[in-house]
Amino acid sequence: MNKKTVKAIACAAAGWLASAGLAQATIVEVTTNVGKFEINLFDETTPVTVQNFLNYVSAGRYDGTVIHRSVPGFVIQGGGFTFDQQLPLKAISTNAAIVNEPKWSNVRATVAMAKLPNNPNSATSQWFINLANNGANLDVQNSGFSVFGQISSADMAVIDAIAALPRYNFPGIDDLPLRNYSSSDRDDNKPLAADNLITIESVVVVDARSNTAAALSLVPNSAPPPASNDSAGGSLSWLTLLPLGLLLLRRRA
């Protein structure tokens, strides 16, 4: 075996070990330009979804992304786009879609993956945080949305503050939460600055134990889908302008 082969195997093994270690991480800290919050990941019960999320974390792809959608009393959504001094938002590079793991209910303070309509196994990078108990809706749409983490009640203060920000519609994007930006600014078509958007500055692992979710009182999915994972219909839709590729959850009246 030559030196190049040995080196290649060693590098591959090191990468595998790093990935395996990261898969055990169960608490991450998300730092935004308006505050920090932690997500306790359910790696023991939704391993595929958690590993997918951590792959984006380890690659730094969530750093610099923005909260691109906010619907009061429903969800805030992120993990898909960056702002480069002007609209439209730019989509981040995504990995292959993952299998659906709808084990837990979409109750307040849980984090779940967004996905395409009529396709249960289409989640990639985008996620959303439930602002209310949305199980009656999101547990049944599109074979259920995969909840893979939870935010503490204390840290939800940061999430609620984001949800309380005014929202604006722009070409290609609706319900964009902004700070230090007014309706008059929008009427005057004032250009957005980076500081106006809610930006995720970093996502880092802060607790690498594999069982930190064991003490949580998790709520099972209220309507588990059939084993075939057949979709019951349009849970998500593209926004009006397709080039953004923005995933959108449907809120029922």
Report the location of each language-model feature.
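Residues at the start of alpha-helices and the adjacent loop-to-helix junctions
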Residues: 4-7, 17, 141
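Bacterial N-terminal signal peptides
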Residues: 10-18, 243-246
